[in-house]
Amino acid sequence: TIPDLITIGVFTALYFVLVAVATLFSSVALMGFGMILLPAVAALICGCVYMLLVAKVGKFGAISVMGIVVGLFLFVSGHFILSLAASIVFPVIADAIARAGDYRSKTGILASYVVFCYGLTGPILPLWFMKDAYVASLQARGKDSSYIDGVFAHVNTGTFFIAMIVVLVCALLGGWFGQRMLKKHFAKTGII
């Protein structure tokens, strides 16, 4: 419905703002690892927005649309097609998980949020799986070899697994915090 689409649009905009904050924080505070850990930082701070979206809309498609809009933005802004693919696949799976619990199961919604958070790994996956294309992309944008070496300084199999585990932990914490805020503050004020 139109009100649902407006709600999805508002929460997607809020999600974008929080991802921008996560980007700024990770690039300043996590020198050298900022890009690799960006999805984890975003997972940590975006739980409230996700939980509010699920509580307000509670229908299949809301989570998927938010993820797809993010993926389209990433793709249009110059990221690889892998960004778009991850931003479609993970949110649709997350939507299906939340739907399985009728958008009411706390555990199901938390699991859904964890899966959704992996959608934001799309921009960093090419670091490990499309290195040559990533290097060519950086060279095409005029980046010199020292910059490129800096980008790949911490990229190895170990950091891939560490990054994915940190996303899991941060998504669990961010989702748990979002659920607590939903119950403690938003439900009492009548927002949901």
Where are these regions (language model features)?
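Membrane topogenic helices and adjacent juxtamembrane segments
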Residues: 1-27, 138-143, 147-156, 162, ...
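Hydrophobic alpha-helical transmembrane segments
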Residues: 5-10, 40-44, 63-68, 81-85, ...
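Alpha-helical transmembrane segments of multipass membrane proteins
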Residues: 11-23, 46, 50, 74, ...
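Membrane-interfacial segments
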Residues: 22-30, 57, 61, 81, ...
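Membrane-embedded alpha-helical hairpins and interfacial helices in multi-pass inner-membrane proteins
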Residues: 35, 110-183
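Cytoplasmic juxtamembrane interface segments
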Residues: 86-116
